[in-house]
Amino acid sequence: SNFNTSNVTSMQSMFEGCSNLIELDLNSFNTSKVSNMSYMFYKCKSLKMLNISGFDTINLNNMSRMFWYCSSLISLDLSNFDTSNVTTMERTFADCSSLVSLNLTNLITNKVVDMSYMFNSCKSLISIDISGFNTSNVTNMEGMFGFCQKIVTLSLTNFNTSKVTKMANMFQECVSLIDLNLTSFDTSNVVDMRGMFQNCKSLTTINLLNFDTSNVTNMWRMFLNCSSLKELDLSNFTTSKVTNMESMFHACVSMTELDLSNFTTAESNLKGMFMYCEKIEILNIRNFDFQNVNNYENIFKQIKSNVKIIVKDNTQKNWLNTNFSNLTNIVVAD
C-alpha cells in the first residue's frame, strides 16, 4: 500500500515468471503515467485472482503479452480500461487456458494495429463479446482466435479488415465452432491465409463468396481437416499469386462438392491438396494448369476413382489420365 508508482512509465515484465503467485491485488497502484504493460503478468501460471480495477490506463499504448500464460486465471474484467491509445494487443490473453469470463465491454481499439494471437489458446472461453471492437487500423490478425476450442459461435460482422494483411491460423483448431459469419470481411490486402480454418471440425458451412484473394500468396492447409464441411464454393477466389496450396483441403472427409472453377495454379505447390477427400463427387478445377505445377505428390490420394473432375481442355485431361490412371471420370468443361 506504500508502494508509490505515480511516476512509473513502464511496468513491462513486472511480475513475469511469478509462477507461485495465486492472488494479486493492485487496486492501489497509480498507473496514470504507465505506457507499457507488456509481459506484465507473463507466466503467472498459478494466478487465480487479479484485481486491477483501479488501473488508470489513459497513457497505455502497449498491452502485448500482458496476461500471456496466466493459465489459472478464471475471470478477467477490463471494462474499466481506457485503451484509446493502445496500438498493440498481440498475445494479450494468449494461453489463458482456464479463462471462462472475459469482460472487454468498453475497450477502445481504434488505434490498435496488431491483434495477432490475441485470444489464442483461450481453451475454456465459450464466447467472446467483441462487438464493440474497432479494427479499422489492424493489419495483423494471425492466430487471433486459434485454439479457442470451446467457442461455438463467433460474430465478426462489425470487423473492419480492410488493412489486414495476415490472417494465417486465424481460426485454427476452433474445433467447436459451428457458426462463423465472415460476409463483411474485406480481404483485399490479405497476403497470408495459411491454416486459416485448419481443424475447424464442426463447421458445416461457410460463406466466403465475398473474399478477395487477389493478393494472397499462401493457402497452405487453409481448410485442412474441416471434416464436417460438405460443400464449398470458392469460385470467386483468385489464386494468381498463390504459390502454396499444399494440403489445402486435406481430410475434408465429408466434402461432396468443391467449386474451384476460378483457381489458377501456375508454379504452385499442390502436394496433398485433395488428399483424403473420400466423399467428393464433383471437383471443378476448370482453370488448373498441371504442366506448370511444382509439386502434385498425393494430390488425389484416397479419393474415389469415379469422382467427376472438370478440367479446361483435352491437354489437362490427357495429363491427368497419364499421371493418375485410376481416375475414370475426367471431363472437359463446356
Where are the regions a protein language model picked out?
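Short beta-strand elements of solenoid repeat domains
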Residues: 13-17, 39-43, 65-69, 90-95, ...
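Structural signature of tandem-repeat unit edges
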Residues: 1-9, 20-35, 45-61, 71-87, ...
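Short, aromatic/basic amphipathic alpha-helical patches
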Residues: 297-300, 316-329
